[in-house]
Amino acid sequence: MRLHEYQAKQVFADAGIPTPASQLAETVDEAVDAAEEIGYPVAIKAQVHVGGRGKAGGIKLVESKEEAREAAEDIIGMDLKGYHVSKVLVEEAVDFVNELYVGVTMDRGEGRPVAMVSTKGGVNIEEVAEEDPDAIAREHIDPAFGMHPFQARKVVYEAGVDREVANDVASVLTTLYQLWDDRDGADTEINPLMITSDDEVIAADAVMNVDGDALFRQPEIAEMGEEAAEGDELEQKADEYGFDYVRLDGNVGIIGNGAGLVMTTLDLVDYYDGEPANFLDVGGGAKADRIANALDMVFSDENVDSVVFNIFGGITRGDEVANGINQALEQFDEIPKPVTVRLAGTNAEEGMEILNEDLVTVEHTLEDAVQRAVEYAKEVEA
């Protein structure tokens, strides 16, 4: 479960990490009043779970009351990559001389958490990791003992952080790890951690993903989660239907039964140069209505250009899946997005006979199904 920026910053601030002065606003007037109280210049930032908010018009720097009103009117109520913006964070603009990245996540290959620091902050850290992996210093942590101060200092110095602020950055990293551990974090990061001309460190952004299966022991975070889901109609719909759903940034919609099967499909979409739009696990024993709901939901994502079903029947029967797909598609005069289906396992042959091949493309192997779905998505892009 991912918290909004304003929620993550509150958690960070409560733990002692410096953050800019800010106020949450739900209306234009509230945003203007907040800007006046904080003092210009301020940043007005859409509170939605998407990357690249600035490039998409979801973050604006303003220097006057008139600019604040205009920016708030533009951002509040806008659709940002499929997310409805209902709240903005009005935040003090930080005058900085340098930007860093600091983060803690789980290295599943090593089976241990890893702390990361880079002097290439303020940009997409995934791109940095791909293009210049040596620009990110890493330190694995033994969860039995936690992060020692010397480890924090070591990774900060290895990243090339200036000595004048190295101890403060190490302190922030140590706190970030403690939050990751105490709050059952999946990812915690600050990008950018800004360095001012006075050698102060300030968390200008905040990301906190929490293990959803651990929310029973994180009541405060769970309460935040109800608010964090607001504004994303697809995630709300997934909760209503009882689907395990994660929205991604690509254009190939993915529906499967079982987390491992869906993850494999995501990996194959990426392998064949496609971009997954979502993770959607309908669960075991899915009936026709449930399959139809899943397809309707993925269709409603405007970023999706093609859909692939990957179903391996155990208690989920192929004929039920086929009936659900037909049920969902027969309501349309024209199929809005191409659908590719791969069925295997229980009643798979019956299911393939039931499927209306005028409405879907049937493939007999997962590789063929994924390649076809990626091709369809690329045809739409072209």
UniProtKB/Swiss-Prot annotation:
Coiled coil: none
EC nos: 6.2.1.5
Example GO BP: tricarboxylic acid cycle
Keyword terms, alphabetized: ATP-binding, Ligase, Magnesium, Metal-binding, Nucleotide-binding, Tricarboxylic acid cycle
Cofactor note: Binds 1 Mg(2+) ion per subunit.
Top EC class of this enzyme: ligase
Highest taxon above the source species: Archaea
Pathway: Carbohydrate metabolism; tricarboxylic acid cycle; succinate from succinyl-CoA (ligase route): step 1/1
Catalysed reaction equations from the record: succinate + ATP + CoA = succinyl-CoA + ADP + phosphate; GTP + succinate + CoA = succinyl-CoA + GDP + phosphate
Cellular component terms (Gene Ontology): succinate-CoA ligase complex
Requisite cofactors: Mg(2+)
UniProt keyword Magnesium present: yes
Disulfide bonds: none
Subunit structure, interactors included: Heterotetramer of two alpha and two beta subunits.
HAMAP family recorded: Succ_CoA_beta
NCBIfam families in alphabetical order: PRK00696.1, sucCoAbeta
Family to which this protein belongs: Belongs to the succinate/malate CoA ligase beta subunit family.
Protein name per the record: Succinate--CoA ligase [ADP-forming] subunit beta
Source organism of the structure: Haloarcula marismortui (strain ATCC 43049 / DSM 3752 / JCM 8966 / VKM B-1809)
